[in-house]
Amino acid sequence: MDVRQLRSLVTLVEVRFSVSRAAECLHLVQSAVTQHLKQLEAELGTRLFVRHGKRLVGLTEVGEQVLRHACEALRQTGNIVAVGREHLEEERRRIRLGATHTQARYVLPPVIRRFAAAYPAVELQIHQGTPGQLVD
């Protein structure tokens, strides 16, 4: 089971069981959505959909339960992605700079002041040491 299958299920229900509209919403071809749904049913070993001929017209009782869990799983997946993006944004706002003691004392102070004024959201971390220490 994967996120694509769960998204296909949730989207299908949102568009009232129209596979073509679900595919359009997901920017997929119809056969991909159909495949996701078949794979999901196969993995779970049960029917999730009420069918009228070949058409999907509703969810079975198990399908309703799976839908609730799928919605929660997708919400949690969104939270995980948000945490990752927040961390990435924090990393993008941090610059680590290595400098010798002389550079840190005499060269960098005016440069750091100008940089901090121009980019207040960026955190500068200055590490001082000998050239050999800074390589590590």
Curated annotation (Swiss-Prot):
GO MF annotation list: DNA-binding transcription factor activity; transcription cis-regulatory region binding
Transcription regulation listed as a keyword: yes
Protein name: HTH-type transcriptional regulator CysB
Species whose genome carries this gene: Thiocapsa roseopersicina
Keywords of this entry: Activator, DNA-binding, Transcription, Transcription regulation
Record gene name: cysB
General function of this protein: This protein is a positive regulator of gene expression for the cysteine regulon.
Gene Ontology biological process terms in this record: cysteine biosynthetic process
Pfam families given in the database record: HTH_1 (PF00126), LysR_substrate (PF03466)
Superkingdom of this protein's organism: Bacteria
Residue ranges of every copy of the HTH lysR-type domain listed in the record: 1-59
DNA-binding region, residues: 19-38
Similarity field: Belongs to the LysR transcriptional regulatory family.
UniProt cross-references to InterPro entries, sorted A to Z: LysR_subst-bd (IPR005119), Tscrpt_reg_HTH_LysR (IPR000847), WH-like_DNA-bd_sf (IPR036388), WH_DNA-bd_sf (IPR036390)
